[in-house]
Each structure stands twice: as structure tokens, then as C-alpha cells.
Amino acid sequence: MHRRRRLVNIFKIGSVLIVLAGLGWGLSWLSYRPFWNIATVDVHGTVSVAAPSVQVLAANDINGAYGWLISKSNQILYPRGKIAGDIEKNFPQVAAVQLAVSSDHVLTVNVTERQPAYRWCAAPDFAPNFPDAPTALATNQCYFMDNLGLIFMPVPGGNEVLVATSSMTTPTTGPQLFRFYGRVASTSVPVGASYTNKTDFAALAQLVFKMASQHLPSYALVSRPDGVDELFLNQGGAIIFDDGQDLTQVATDVAALQQSTTIFANGSKLEYVDVRLGNKAFYKLVDTATSTASQ
């Protein structure tokens, strides 16, 4: 009796395994049928990225099978997330990837590339003298950054000479892009790194725009290793503040100086304004020996 029951159980288990194996084989067979599979990969939207390289990467991701059974090139089951993730990982200048399969079995990869909004450059090995900052900050080690502060590609063809001009009223207009220096190690290729977190970068960019709206356009921000930031003005001189300082208050303090002094007037030779000391700002003019505290 027990033997018969055991044989029945073995038969049932065997039948289930045979059915499962049959289903697996059937699904595998169906997944490889041409009418279910991607035949070719097309890439659109690339500018600086080589489209053939993206095409090869996507084609490699749909090659093979899941668990040696289900085709990865199946139009329903192809690895969307992996393809998009691999493209963004291997090509930092890519901001977004959209995938779609057409009725003629073509996988279309639509790429959106990042747009240069700023430049990141390796910081000088010394603190630039404020009157000579454009010369001291000139460098060939510059990379494009997007509007979120991500460094995504080298500036092609070298860099133009850094010259502060009155036409640079905002970071993204005028003959040059606004430059950020420091924070990212320059000993290795910085592509893929961020200048700082998105919130802090947005605050820094907002300060640049705020200064421009107060008729104090700037061309570069240097973040020093000691935690001090210097915003270099087109008219000459710099605004000095601490990393992590309330940047809204920085703009307010500078605006107060504009109202109470003439240090920003045309013809003045400002060396720096230091707003690191709470409710007082210090400023120094070129060729003067000491700084002056605002009232």
C-alpha cells in the first residue's frame, strides 16, 4: 500500500516536472521566434557621443538569454533598465535614454545629451592675486558641466583665453561660460563627478545670478581647499565667503555695501569684499594697506 502510494506520488511529481519542462521549452522556443525578436538597433539624438558605440552597447545587452532559456532580444522582455543604465554609465554626457520597439522589429534608442551650462576647471596651485585673477585662473584643464553641476566631457579644442568682460551678465551668456574651480580632484579624469550636491550647487548658481541682477556680474568661482570660496567679479576684485555659508545672506550683505559705499562704482579698484564675519563686511581696495569694515 505504502509502495503504491509512493509510486503514485513519484508519478505525480514526474508529471509536474515534465509539464514544467515542456512549458519552459515552449516559452523558450516562442521567445526566440523572429516575430517576437528585435532585429536591429537604431540610435538617435547623439551629438558628441558616437552613435555606433551606443548601438554596440545596446546590442550586447540584448544578446544571450535569461537563464539560458528566454531570449533577451524578445520585444517584450528585453532589458530596458540595463540598456538605459549602461548607456548613461558609459557615456556621462547622456542625460536621458528612451527606448521603443517598432513593428518592424527595430529597437530605437533616443538619447538626450547634457547641455553645457558651465565649465569646471582644475584649481590653481596657489591663491590667485585678485587684480590678476583672469591670468592666474587661465588653464587648459577645463570640462563642461551641466546645470546640475555634473562634469560630463572635456572642452573640445582647448580653451579660449579667460578674460572678464562686461557682457558676461549671466553664467550662460556672453563669450564664455562661467567657470567653477576646485572641489573635484584634478589628479584624475573628473568626468562623471559632481561639483557638489545638487542643492548646494543650485544655491551657488543662484548666488551668481543674484550678483548679476545686482549689476555685479562675475566670471569664476574658486573653492579653496581651506573651505573658503571666492567669487571673481568682471569689474575686478572678488567676494569672499565660507563654504556652507548662507548665500542669501551673502547677497544681502553685498547689496548693503552697494548702498552704503562706492566701492563697486565705475573706476573704483576693488581688491576684495569679505563677508565671512557675520554682521560686518570687510573690503579692501587695490594699493591700500588695510581693509575697511562696513558700518
Q: What role is predicted for each listed range?
A:
Residues 45:
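Glycine-rich Rossmann NAD(P)(H)-binding loop
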